[in-house]
Amino acid sequence: DLPSAPIRRLLFEAPENTQGIWEIAEFEIYGKGFTPAASYVSNVIDLGGNAALGELSWQAEVDAGAQVELGMRAGDDDDPNTYWRNTFRGDERTRLDTRGRVMTLRSYNRLEKAQQAGITPDTENWEGWSAPYDLRADSAPMQSNKPRQFVQLRADFLSTVEAGGRLGYVQFAVSQPPVATLVSAEITPTLAPSGEITQFTYLLLPQMEFGDLGFDTIEIDTPTAIEGVDAVRFSGEDVAFDVMRIDERGFEIAIPRVDQTRDGELIEVVFSSPVFKFGTLFSGRVYDSTQPLEVRQVITAGEVDELVESNTLSVGLSNLSAEVVGALKLVPAAFTPNGDGINDQVRIEYDLLNVAGSAEVTVVLYDLRGGRIGEVFRGPARSGQFQTAWDGRDQ
């Protein structure tokens, strides 16, 4: 039997066949379990032109005790790396070869060892690797801050002898051409008091080129259901709009169509919303409602109006404190659980403030003497507004 420990190489030795009485026709080795670690990196995938990146989907099987990490990155050229050459002038190094051309992998490999100064990620033209996707889901949005032409995928496998992981397939959706070459956006103000309704202005600047599809709908993510959309302005002038959706995930509005005739025109969306967590991200997307199957194009954070000192879609808290629970109230303040259908339940409403990630939340009731009545809720929650109901019965 082979040893149970993982092995990489195996030496097979047979005595010299001096009399020619035997020969080897086939040689097979069988082992148990899975390779402890393996990694797959795809070739750079050329989409043929800039495209809006949509959903990444997969089929995965991961045994208990094993781990599979799937990630992706996107860029603007066909090589995600930068190659450096020593100039031998002190510690100076350059990305150019001796003829002044930007080096490629091929030209880098032709250098003498002493000339090779290393390979680094190309952060100018490529985004970094995404965080690993949660494979318990079947799909998730591709992580890219704007339309890109090139995509690369990576999968890392960590296994034990008895547990392994498998990827059946990985696929992704794109729309080409995109609805816009680029849609930049920033939000103001960038600081707000925790849990209080604040009016925000979401500024967008579309960059439209020939062939872009155009868009007529804006989708903005919010930490809770907003109070409402107060105004939409094109170049400072109010325009008509329709609210298509408002819920706990955000809102969507229909606006006058944006195409090449509105290239570089400032769009403002004014809405009111509370913020519960430092660094709340108001991400957004634009799309063409007449083509619902196309990818919704992500909005890129950046400078839109030089008079607005933001350049971000993130909002912080102006009154950081150690309090985690805010705005606790009972609705109605008094209730009568007598079964007549009127005020038979009380709704316990509260805000969770500045919670990092997800936390375990427990709602426990006590009487006026401090005696425990019971637990009415237990479960994970993030920063935001929450409510739970109690029917007046001991739990």
Question: What do the predicted segments below correspond to?
Answer:
Residues 1-323, 336:
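Beta-strand-rich ligand- or partner-binding modules
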Residues 317-395:
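Short loop/turn motifs at secondary-structure boundaries
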